Amino acid sequence: MDTTATIGWGIAGTGRIARTVLDDFAHVPGARISAVASRSIARADTFADLVSQSLGTPRPNAHDSYAEMIANPAVDVIYVATPHPQHRPIALAAIEAGKAVLVEKSFAATAEAATEMAEAARAHEVFAMEGMWTRFLPVVTEMIDAVNSGAIGEPTGVQGDLFALRDYDPEDRLFSPALGGGVTLDLGVYALDFAIRLLGEPTEVIARGKHFPNGVDSDASMLLTFPKDKFATLAISLTSDGPGRMTIQGTDGWIEVEPRFHHPSRILIHRRGVIPKVHNTPALGRGYAHELIEVCECLRAGRTESQTMPLDASLAVARTMANILDQLGVENHDDTELPS
């Protein structure tokens, strides 16, 4: 693909996260939303109008069929912004059609589906990436560079939380067993990805938690052990408020990621006897633009995976979440057919 080529995007799903990400396309050079799809043509039409109004661009095609949008020749990459169980069939259909995919986190509702999606992308040599936007934020990139350069010595552990108090509504996707609701897939994915990126895949996981009345996981505390006796202690909740802070411990110092850690703009690097070094780097837009830019750059360069968010990292997180959910007694399922 030409290094200056315009990338045509299709958006599968018109709900909360699709609307949140939409405005950040204004910060992505050479990206065009060519099509949107929902199971309802009314919702697709409304969202297509919103795209045009928000971005000041031509109105994208509106589809009431995900298969039709995937087949649209103006679409190069599909952003899968549907509930977790629907990621599998939409992503697989797109991959089999040769279309790249950016799959909203969590990558899938189960580790088995995540593995199937990754294997399909590799077999078809099609780009696939989980939408873990935190990894691409400028200040997070600076944090990783600092760790890799030895700013705090050898990292030894991670400690943090992500609490987001929500009113229980069994009709809402966030709380629905059928739609992959629950704290682990919604918030835990951030905390686990943060720890796994720094320390690798855990060798042991101990999890305890609570549930909503319908059995969906509401809270969890996790103790993870990693190679070389490194560890992480993490807490997540949909029933309590909390700061959303992360710290990285090292042999020569520590890093504080100020709340909220999954979309920070400021980190502090502490070393004994030294004034903390502050990194304060804002993101473009709401912060989603950086992952969208990464996808476009990968496609223009002919890459099938992102070096910043490789599929193996998504699979490590998926396996760890599966372990946690098993300990909490929660069983998720992925859809097998395209939503209709």
Q: What does each model-identified segment do?
A:
Residues 1-3, 31, 77-79, 227, ...:
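C-terminal helix-rich "cap/oligomerization" subdomain common to oxidoreductases
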Residues 281-293, 309:
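Active-site loop of classical SDR/Rossmann-like NAD(P)-dependent oxidoreductases
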Residues 134-206:
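Predominantly a Rossmann-like dinucleotide-binding segment in NAD(P)-dependent oxidoreductases
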Residues 1-3, 193-264, 282, 294-301, ...:
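Contiguous beta-strand/loop segments that form the cofactor/metal-binding neighborhood of enzyme cores
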Residues 1-55:
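N-terminal Rossmann-like dinucleotide-binding module
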Residues 58-120:
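Beta-loop-alpha module in the N-terminal Rossmann-like domain of NAD(P)-dependent dehydrogenases
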Residues 11, 103, 128-130, 257:
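Hydrophobic residues in well-ordered beta-strands that form the structural core
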Residues 116-134, 154-160:
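Rossmann-fold dehydrogenase core element
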